[in-house]
């Protein structure tokens, strides 16, 4: 438990996450993420991203580029890097204001992987195996452990920011 408290301290005080506009400190936290694994289309915009733009005016928005989640299926490292930069530019272009919100890359905040690992050590494998996506894909030859532990990384993402709202 002490280690988890240390992780919260690290995230809240020593990373880019703490650089949000001081005016946002009293606002409730909204946390959401998007993978840099494909081209953004009108469905992404209308289904999620437009909502983020609106939410940043009322809440303290943490918009995560979920590159660690994206690598649960094989990806070319150069493609992920390129798509991550492209996605960051796109988020700003559609109206996510870096002066109102925090836009960050998941892998640049080590606490995500660290807390994810801690949660992995506390989570029964049977619980993870019940995940629908895992059940559907486990028979394929290319299924990796990252898919199995995806839910614990998602939980870590949310817990680190103590979000009150997590739009999906």
What are these regions (language model features)?
Residues 5, 11-14:
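Acidic, Ala/Val/Gly-enriched low-complexity intrinsically disordered segments
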Residues 14-156, 163:
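N-terminal Rossmann-like or analogous alpha/beta NTP/dinucleotide-binding catalytic cores
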Residues 164-168:
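Glycine-rich, Lys/Arg-enriched anion-binding loops that position phosphate/diphosphate groups
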């Amino acid at each position: 438990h002490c280690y988890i408290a240390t992780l919260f301290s690290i995230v809240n005080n020593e990373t880019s996450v703490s650089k949000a506009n001081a005016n946002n400190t009293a606002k409730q936290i909204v946390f959401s993420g998007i993978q840099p694994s494909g081209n953004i289309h009108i469905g992404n915009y209308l289904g999620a991203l437009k909502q983020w733009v609106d939410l940043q005016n009322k809440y303290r928005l943490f918009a995560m580029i979920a590159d660690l989640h994206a690598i649960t299926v094989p990806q070319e490292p150069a493609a992920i890097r390129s798509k991550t930069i492209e996605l960051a530019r796109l988020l700003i272009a559609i109206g996510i204001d870096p002066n109102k919100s925090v836009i960050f890359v998941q892998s640049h905040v080590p606490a995500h992987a660290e807390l994810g690992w801690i949660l992995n050590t506390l989570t029964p494998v049977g619980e993870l195996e019940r995940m629908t996506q895992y059940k559907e894909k486990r028979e394929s030859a290319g299924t990796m452990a990252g898919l199995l532990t995806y839910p614990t990384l998602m939980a870590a993402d949310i817990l680190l920011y103590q979000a009150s709202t997590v739009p999906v």
